[in-house]
Amino acid sequence: MAQIFKATKKPLKQQSLVLDITAMDHHGRGIAKHNNKVCFVSNALPNEQVKATIIADKARYSEAQTHKVLQASEYRVAPFCEHYNQCGGCQLQHLDSSQQVVEKQIAVSKLFEKFAKLDELNWQAPLLSKATHYRRSARLAVMFDKKAKKMHVGYRASGSKSIISINECPVLSEVFANVFTVFDNLINQHKALHSVSHLQLCQGDEQNFVIIRHTKPISEDIKALVAQSAAEQQWQLVWQSESEVIEHSHLAMPFYALEELGLKFEFGLNNFIQVNASVNQAMLKQAQNWLALKGDENVLDLFCGIGNFSLVLAKQAKTVIGVEGVASAVAMATQNAHTNSITNAQFNCFDLTNKIETASWFNKNLDVLVLDPSRTGAITVLEQLPLKQFKTILYVSCDPVTLARDSAIISQAGFELHKIGLMNMFPHTGHIETMALFQRR
């Protein structure tokens, strides 16, 4: 039998280097040069000099971790969370909140220059968030620590699968302030709860939910004990077995209201909603203002979810067609249209990664295109849609790289980037949300 030689991977030498940081990338990492390659440096800011250790050395770039700041930026601040240096949830607490937005905007501009060949962007004022307690949903991990011989409830460590035990998360909604200690105590006191793999948190306007995912059956007696502790915190419990379905029909449907827009959105606990409630409302108002619909437009809203944009725009448009690949979200969008007495919006379930030429909504007489894709972007639909039929395209992005890439396609189809603005949906993280408005030349 022939043996195939496989070279042993050499361990990386722990080099300590002095690096001069010249810029920040779109993940919130400092950028330096080392050995004629770009080096991405965590916990480093532009115009700083740091001592760092190389943690990955690739063919075209390297990665490093700062362990000492030799010359600090004027915008460097002390992190406000006790877990910041271990937890992987936030990446930018060491940077002043206002400057975070500035650096993110610079990073997006560079991506547009690189991928879309656009070097002058008409930046609008960013949509800002409060600095703390902005998350209305989160996912917590639960894992057994062999060394400590106990279960931990917390977040994943930065760059690791291990769990950081958390006392309190200052970016999480205050209604869940005690969730870590309450469940840490419960799970460690009752061995039957060691089958809990994670907790999902979701805050509605009137109810706060904790979904408990478990891999083995849990007795009703234990469930009652957990329910009692949850009731003291005003949390609604939902138990989820290995099945992916989150069954909560026995509880009132969660919802969020957009009072300024006069809308109410119900959602299932397995549906996607925006994490930051205040920025979501500001984002929808901005979309309404930027599009400035006059009442005779036909709007196509792709990746529409539960109707977040569709129903807002339906109030000003002639018709809105929403398309979404998740059936439960389409059902909620249809229900939300009915709840809000909106009759000019219809919703279709369709996998937008597939060919769309046979879809019932394809090639309609449409004026406005709204895109709100996942991080993979909208390239699949942009390459298939007859874009020239649209007068306006509104693109809402959660990944600036795919936005810049897709903007090149939109520009080549005869559109001009009219406006662009950041939405600081996730302060203190490397995540960048952007809204861009394109108009046909």
Swiss-Prot record:
A Pfam family that this protein carries is TRAM
Annotated catalysed reactions:
uridine(1939) in 23S rRNA + S-adenosyl-L-methionine = 5-methyluridine(1939) in 23S rRNA + S-adenosyl-L-homocysteine + H(+)
Q: What are the BP-aspect GO terms?
A: rRNA base methylation
Where in the sequence is the active site?
A: C398 (nucleophile)
Residues engaged in binding [4Fe-4S] cluster: C81, C87, C90, C169
For this protein, what is the EC number? Answer: 2.1.1.190
Q: Which residues make up the binding site for S-adenosyl-L-methionine?
A: Q274, F303, N308, E324, D351, D372
- All copies of the TRAM domain together span 10-68
Q: What's one GO MF term for it?
A: RNA binding
Q: Which InterPro entries match?
A: 23S_rRNA_MeTrfase_RlmD (IPR001566), MeTrfase_TrmA_AS (IPR030390), MeTrfase_TrmA_CS (IPR030391), NA-bd_OB-fold (IPR012340), SAM-dependent_MTases_sf (IPR029063), TRAM_dom (IPR002792), U5_MeTrfase_fam (IPR010280)
Q: Which residues form the signal peptide?
A: none
Q: Which SUPFAM superfamilies match?
A: Nucleic acid-binding proteins, S-adenosyl-L-methionine-dependent methyltransferases
Q: Any idea which UniProt keywords this protein has?
A: 4Fe-4S, Iron, Iron-sulfur, Metal-binding, Methyltransferase, rRNA processing, S-adenosyl-L-methionine, Transferase
> Which family does the record assign?
Belongs to the class I-like SAM-binding methyltransferase superfamily. RNA M5U methyltransferase family. RlmD subfamily.
Described by its record, this protein's role is as follows:
Catalyzes the formation of 5-methyl-uridine at position 1939 (m5U1939) in 23S rRNA.
Q: By what name is this protein known? A: 23S rRNA (uracil(1939)-C(5))-methyltransferase RlmD
User: Could you read off the lineage of the organism from its UniProt record?
Assistant: Bacteria, Pseudomonadati, Pseudomonadota, Gammaproteobacteria, Alteromonadales
